Amino acid sequence: MAKALMLQGTGSDVGKTLIVAGLCRAYMRRGLRVRPFKPQNMSNNAAVTLDGGEIGRAQALQAQACGVPPSVHMNPVLLKPQSGTGSQIILQGRLSGQAEARTYQAMKKHWLAIVLESFQHLKDEADLVLVEGAGSASEINLRANDIANMGFARAADVPVIVIGDIDRGGVIAQIAGTKLVITPQDAEMVVGFLVNRFRGDPDLFKEGMRQIEHFSGWRGLGLIPHCPAARDLPAEDAMALGRHLNGERSAHTKFKIVVPVLPGIANFDDLDPLRMERGVELIMIRPGTYLPVEADLVLLIGSKTTIADLVAFREAGWDVDLAAYVRRGGKVFGLCGGYQMLGENLRDPLGLEGPPSEVRGLGLLALETVFTQEKTLVAVEGVSLPDEVPFTGFEMHVGHTSGDDCARPFLRLTDGRQDGAVSKDGRIAGCYVHGLFGMDTQRRAFLARFGVAAGDFSYLEKVEAALDAVADHLAQHIDLDHLLTLAR
């Protein structure tokens, strides 16, 4: 029977995903059959499994760390935000429906059986299951019907380690405060804590660790310094985009790619391979910032709420900036939702993204998108055009796109379909397929279209090396043998 251990956080973006991924790799290298598990995830950054299901991208990365294909059971409940208060609901990889936050809070008690079923499925094929919580363990206002943190831990009898982030400050209060507000029954599930992202001399925080132990009654299991290798792994949360993507300009920078950040941004891990190119500078811009005229390429990436994001794009004034940029000879590429925005018209007759509506697109490609009930979720392969460079990737979208510019497709798939469109002058293009830039030959071919010589590195090898480095880093600062004794 497999053992399990759960890592919960004092908040979002404290490093849970990275630590679970690193532990997955560390224990896998010891010969254990390890599986990652996240009962409930809220993210628009998703991945497609081999059977055509959908899970959080972070769990796909953790599966890679374990050396196994991603499975829908690794993330049985995925909530994909569509508005400030509502989400699309994915259960065991399949679209189940949509609900407002108040509604799905009440629905969660019915999802516990699904969560426990998936958890058992993983336990049946593993020696160790490493479980990642969601958000904060101390959100006691959401404790009723909880399936993401302590609710799951108690239902499945899985011991918990609490992670605090010292980099954001107040880590003593983070962890001690968690103990203060949760119930004694929940607190009994906790077997210790980790302090993540420490910078400086660790001896200076020995007293801090003792104080956390004193106020919480939990044992300190490790002080983890900031891990530089984490930069080479995809960001899970949109809130981490700036930390991952906007760095200092390199002396090697030759090609500026500007990416507008919109509220419904999705599948932004498409950007990770590009940011590793020494000759590329990725510039993330947010509302209130103009679109730089010196951009070599404007890249519109995926969106979970294409119409709402198109409205936000216009409210930011970027439509005016983009039109002027194109008039001056600028180049634009759209991925998935960004591709849809480039067209002349977007129609949502069924009200899938809100009330039934029809909105004017950016008008840079002669095409129209109609949103339909059926969701396309499939792994694909083929070649880009006209260079005939092979690719593998996946489609994950709602809607069908057609129009005159589709006569000049960007991709040809092996199943006979064509995908994407290119303007007559070749300066505007887009497609639905995600994952293109993770293919080394395809990324090089894409950049070559703009006269940019790409590096000769392997993106997959960089990610693998980063996972190994994170595992080594954790092994230096955590007693992995002792941690294993805490699992049950």
From Swiss-Prot:
<comment type="similarity">
    <text>Belongs to the CobB/CobQ family. CobQ subfamily.</text>
</comment>
<dbReference type="InterPro" id="IPR011698">
    <property type="entry name" value="GATase_3"/>
</dbReference>
<dbReference type="InterPro" id="IPR033949">
    <property type="entry name" value="CobQ_GATase1"/>
</dbReference>
<dbReference type="InterPro" id="IPR027417">
    <property type="entry name" value="P-loop_NTPase"/>
</dbReference>
<dbReference type="GO" id="GO:0015420">
    <property type="term" value="F:ABC-type vitamin B12 transporter activity"/>
</dbReference>
<dbReference type="InterPro" id="IPR047045">
    <property type="entry name" value="CobQ_N"/>
</dbReference>
<dbReference type="Pfam" id="PF07685">
    <property type="entry name" value="GATase_3"/>
</dbReference>
<dbReference type="InterPro" id="IPR004459">
    <property type="entry name" value="CobQ_synth"/>
</dbReference>
<keyword id="KW-0315">Glutamine amidotransferase</keyword>
<keyword id="KW-0169">Cobalamin biosynthesis</keyword>
<comment type="pathway">
    <text>Cofactor biosynthesis; adenosylcobalamin biosynthesis.</text>
</comment>
<feature type="active site" description="Nucleophile">
    <location>
        <position position="336"/>
    </location>
</feature>
<feature type="domain" description="GATase cobBQ-type">
    <location>
        <begin position="254"/>
        <end position="442"/>
    </location>
</feature>
<dbReference type="InterPro" id="IPR002586">
    <property type="entry name" value="CobQ/CobB/MinD/ParA_Nub-bd_dom"/>
</dbReference>
<comment type="function">
    <text>Catalyzes amidations at positions B, D, E, and G on adenosylcobyrinic A,C-diamide. NH(2) groups are provided by glutamine, and one molecule of ATP is hydrogenolyzed for each amidation.</text>
</comment>
<dbReference type="InterPro" id="IPR029062">
    <property type="entry name" value="Class_I_gatase-like"/>
</dbReference>
<feature type="active site">
    <location>
        <position position="434"/>
    </location>
</feature>
<dbReference type="Pfam" id="PF01656">
    <property type="entry name" value="CbiA"/>
</dbReference>
<dbReference type="GO" id="GO:0009236">
    <property type="term" value="P:cobalamin biosynthetic process"/>
</dbReference>
<dbReference type="GO" id="GO:0003824">
    <property type="term" value="F:catalytic activity"/>
</dbReference>
<protein>
    <recommendedName>
        <fullName>Cobyric acid synthase</fullName>
    </recommendedName>
</protein>
